[in-house]
């Protein structure tokens, strides 16, 4: 896994190679101009914009935005091609997270994609939770396999037979492994790019400890990393909390999660999960160790994962009627430089200035590109890069060349500013930081505006119909949660618990559960979800 400094050096090297190629192109342009050749026709193509607005048809809007540069639909339903624009976002998050877990002494590994039925079915509660989603290989050529082989929906049962082999004594602990891989969950209802797909990329960490205290500590450390991915990189506000018994990981002791919320649809999204598995899997797979007193004990285990769902949440949160809006930290192109030639102005000088500007930014560690395509108008390029979501646009025209300045245009709010070339790098860095922070603050304000505190069933139903993120006092009983699901089941989906936030508001004595009328034990977020 390359570290950020290596990535920076790679970008600079690629930029220098690109500059050399662009010089050849410019020489051809200059030669054509001086020889009096007819200027190439500039395309004024239409159809760049989206056909629907985000607040009018969210589902169609989301599909159109994803299809621009993020994914391509595949000929198998629920499977998608991740194009370079989205894959780069995944790689940037991967670099951050991989470096952080290595600080925690987690090591990367890789386990096979295939699972034998005997192993998969060993942990009854676990497999019952995943059974409807498991895909099976049943043939080899035209012959039926004697024993069908499952494709991993998650890797607990794949990995843990070998944990029992590798762990013998207390000196073998903790064992901390992570793998970056794909998994398959054969979703049959409403596949959605990034959010619900049959195959997706993720990381899954699996750790074993001598004590529950160590496991508990790691659960929260990992959850904090997931919060940072969403809030610091994707500029998406999330709530950290505990899942209910009904919603926790099948076979686990407890599940923590970061939960996002999409105001346009009024739905929550489980952003990432960090589970304490307790000793249940250790019992099933006989993962024991000899402690310092020569006594045999079972290990305590965790598992934790985040996936390419993160990208879908980012698109839903920040995208607008022009297309994507990318936070600078995860944008593969943070700045695009566009020439704006005018009539008989010094076109070659403008092109040279664009190349020099992009190169200066790249040298400073900013991911920048110049768009020197001469068969598209500046206006067409503006729309194209706006749709791609590039955080900052720099325009250079004759007046900018004359005044030794550039014009910047922010993607998040459209604000334009003329800045001197002498302070270009410092100013652009500052702007990118402001864009990142503003995107987070705007998203947080929108989410907070959707939070509705309720105390009665009637208030709950009203808030649910108004697409609110509902915070309600709850008795913390599984049967009551199941009853809420049953009573709210409809065309838009049943309401359920999202999480009980770690940051609990005060619960006055005598507060009753909104659904059962029994004494409330905690505040819990409720809503419909993806």
From Swiss-Prot:
Keyword hit for Nucleotide-binding: yes
One annotated GO biological process: prolyl-tRNA aminoacylation
Annotated disulfide bonds: none
Main location: cytoplasm
Known catalytic reactions: tRNA(Pro) + L-proline + ATP = L-prolyl-tRNA(Pro) + AMP + diphosphate
Keywords: Aminoacyl-tRNA synthetase, ATP-binding, Cytoplasm, Ligase, Nucleotide-binding, Protein biosynthesis
Gene3D superfamilies associated with the record: Anticodon-binding domain (3.40.50.800), Bira Bifunctional Protein, Domain 2 (3.30.930.10), C-terminal domain of ProRS (3.30.110.30)
InterPro entries cross-referenced by the UniProt entry: aa-tRNA-synt_IIb, aa-tRNA-synth_II, aa-tRNA-synth_II/BPL/LPL, Anticodon-bd, Anticodon-bd_dom_sf, Pro-tRNA-ligase_IIa, Pro-tRNA-ligase_IIa_arc-type, Pro-tRNA_ligase_II_C
A single Gene Ontology CC term: cytosol
Enzyme Commission identifier(s): 6.1.1.15
Compartments where found: Cytoplasm, Cytosol
Molecular functions (GO terms): ATP binding; proline-tRNA ligase activity
HAMAP family in the record: Pro_tRNA_synth_type3 (MF_01571)
PANTHER family: BIFUNCTIONAL GLUTAMATE_PROLINE--TRNA LIGASE, PROLYL-TRNA SYNTHETASE
Homology family: Belongs to the class-II aminoacyl-tRNA synthetase family.
Chain's role: Catalyzes the attachment of proline to tRNA(Pro) in a two-step reaction: proline is first activated by ATP to form Pro-AMP and then transferred to the acceptor end of tRNA(Pro).
Name of the molecule in the record: Proline--tRNA ligase, cytoplasmic
């Amino acid at each position: 896994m390359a570290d950020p400094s290596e990535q920076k050096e790679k970008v600079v090297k690629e930029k220098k190679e690109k500059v050399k190629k662009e010089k050849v192109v410019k020489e051809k342009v200059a030669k054509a101009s001086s020889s009096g050749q007819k200027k190439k026709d500039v395309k004024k193509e239409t159809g760049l914009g989206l056909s629907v607005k985000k607040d009018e048809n969210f589902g169609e809007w989301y599909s159109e935005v994803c299809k621009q540069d993020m994914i391509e639909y595949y000929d198998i339903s629920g499977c998608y091609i991740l194009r370079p624009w989205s894959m780069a976002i995944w790689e940037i998050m991967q670099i951050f997270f991989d470096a952080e877990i290595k600080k925690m002494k987690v090591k990367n590994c890789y386990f096979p994609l295939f699972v034998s039925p005997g192993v998969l079915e060993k942990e009854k509660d676990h497999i019952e939770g995943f059974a409807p989603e498991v895909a099976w290989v049943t043939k080899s050529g035209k012959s039926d396999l004697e024993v069908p082989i499952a494709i991993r929906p998650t890797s607990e049962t794949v990995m843990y037979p070998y944990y029992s082999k590798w762990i013998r004594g207390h000196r073998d602990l903790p064992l901390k492994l992570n793998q970056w891989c794909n998994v398959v969950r054969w979703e049959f209802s409403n596949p959605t790019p990034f959010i619900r797909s049959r195959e997706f990329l993720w990381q899954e960490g699996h750790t074993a400890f001598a004590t529950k205290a160590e496991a508990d500590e790691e659960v929260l450390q990992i959850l904090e990393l997931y919060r940072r991915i969403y809030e610091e990189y994707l500029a998406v506000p999330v709530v950290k909390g505990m899942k209910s018994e009904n919603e926790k990981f099948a076979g686990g002791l407890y599940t923590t999660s970061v939960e996002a919320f999409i105001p346009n649809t009024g739905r929550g999204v489980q952003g990432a999960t960090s589970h304490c598995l307790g000793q249940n899997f250790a019992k099933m797979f006989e993962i024991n160790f000899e402690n310092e007193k020569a006594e045999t004990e079972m290990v305590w285990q965790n598992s934790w994962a985040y996936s390419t769902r993160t990208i879908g949440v980012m698109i839903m949160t920040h995208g607008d009627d022009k297309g994507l809006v990318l936070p600078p930290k995860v944008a593969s192109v943070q700045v695009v430089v566009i020439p704006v030639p005018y009539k008989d102005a010094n076109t070659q000088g403008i092109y040279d200035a664009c190349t020099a500007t992009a190169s200066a930014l790249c040298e400073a560690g900013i991911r920048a590109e110049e768009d020197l395509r001469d068969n598209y108008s500046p206006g067409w390029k503006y729309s194209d890069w706006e749709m791609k979501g590039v955080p900052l646009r720099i325009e250079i025209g004759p007046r900018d060349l004359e005044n030794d300045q550039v014009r910047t245009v922010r993607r998040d709010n459209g604000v334009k500013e003329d800045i001197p070339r002498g302070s270009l790098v410092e100013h652009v860095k500052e702007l990118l930081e402001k864009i990142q922070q503003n995107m987070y603050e705007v998203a947080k304000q929108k989410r907070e505006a959707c939070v509705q505190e309720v105390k009665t069933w009637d208030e709950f139903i009203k808030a649910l119909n108004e697409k609110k993120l509902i915070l309600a006092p709850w008795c913390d009983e599984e049967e009551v949660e199941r009853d809420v699901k049953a009573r709210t089941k409809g065309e838009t989906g049943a309401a359920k618990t999202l999480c009980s936030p770690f940051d609990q508001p005060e619960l006055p004595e005598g507060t009753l559960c909104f659904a059962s009328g029994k004494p409330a034990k905690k505040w819990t977020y409720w809503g419909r979800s993806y």
